[in-house]
Amino acid sequence: MASSTDVRPKITLACEVCKHRNYITKKNRRNDPDRLELKKFCPNCGVHRAHKESR
């Protein structure tokens, strides 16, 4: 089981417009302590949009 203090936890990225959770990735907590935001393709919207880390 993954620890809550894991250095590279799994996170879910959700589209900012339609709120669909499209991507699962890992992030390094030491390098990115804040919420991650990436520009990814949203298959629901059909365009590239900002995806933020959801909790």
Swiss-Prot record:
Keywords of this entry: Ribonucleoprotein, Ribosomal protein
Keyword Ribonucleoprotein among record annotations: yes
GO biological process: translation
Pfam families: Ribosomal_L33 (PF00471)
Keyword Metal-binding annotated: no
CC per GO annotation: cytoplasm; ribonucleoprotein complex; ribosome
MF (Gene Ontology): structural constituent of ribosome
Domain of life: Bacteria
Family: Belongs to the bacterial ribosomal protein bL33 family.
The protein, known as: Large ribosomal subunit protein bL33A
Organism: Mycobacterium sp. (strain JLS)
Encoding gene per record: rpmG1
